[in-house]
Design a protein with these regions (language model features):
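Tandem repeat scaffolds
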Residues: 2-220
Length: 220
């Protein structure tokens, strides 16, 4: 009997933030470091916060349209009800981060590094993770129009009760990526599914894509 292969789940610790001091979002500056602050009901739209570093911080009801978070670092940080039609954070670093109840239009995270990151109850238009390095990431109860994982490296990434209209896996490298609770309508890069776990229903839905890739003619 063949040995059953188990899919490793993301390792995500609970985020506990205590004794935070009230921070002033308008005073945030690029390449500065911030720790133990809570920023509530703030609008940082259009600000340059590139290279900034945040540790043990919380952002609640923040408007961040076209805010430049390029190469910023977030460690043990929580985002609640974040809103941004355009969210700019390429080459950023997220570690032990929770993003909850947020709405993002175009979210640019390409070439970023994520470790122990949880998205829950979020609505995202285009999530660009091309060339990103993802480890221990969970998407829970999210709706994503387009998820671009082209050339990304993903290990222990899971989706629960999540819908993605278009998923691009072109040249991605997957390990322990659990897609069983993910509803996908369109898939690009089916040849790069190695390392993903799917269920029998999903396999049947993928049959036309697999047949096309392998040059198999389906004819009843």
């Amino acid at each position: 009997m063949a040995k059953k292969i188990l899919t490793a789940a993301p390792l995500i610790d609970a985020l506990l933030l205590q004794n935070l001091v009230v921070g002033d979002a308008k005073s945030l500056r690029a390449h500065e470091s911030y720790s133990g602050e809570r920023f509530a009901v703030s609008d940082v739209g259009g600000q340059d916060l590139s290279g900034a570093s945040f540790s043990e911080c919380e952002f609640v009801e923040m408007e961040a349209n076209e805010t430049n978070f390029r190469a910023a670092t977030f460690v043990e940080t929580h985002f609640g009800r974040l809103t941004a039609p355009i969210f700019i954070a390429p080459r950023s670093n997220f570690r032990d981060v929770s993003i909850e109840g947020s709405r993002l239009g175009s979210a640019e995270f390409y070439e970023s590094t994520w470790k122990s990151v949880r998205f829950s109850h979020c609505r995202i238009g285009y999530l660009n993770l091309r060339g990103a390095h993802l480890r221990d990431v969970l998407f829970d109860d999210c709706v994503i129009d387009e998820l671009d994982l082209g050339a990304a490296t993903a290990n222990r990434v899971s989706f629960t009760n999540t819908q993605v209209d278009t998923l691009d896996l072109t040249r991605s490298v997957l390990t322990n990526v659990d897609l069983r609770s993910l509803e996908v309508r369109h898939l690009t890069g089916v040849e790069h599914l190695k390392g993903a776990t799917i269920n029998s229903h999903q396999l049947a839905e993928l049959a036309p894509f697999l047949a096309n890739h392998l040059g198999i003619v389906l004819n009843e």
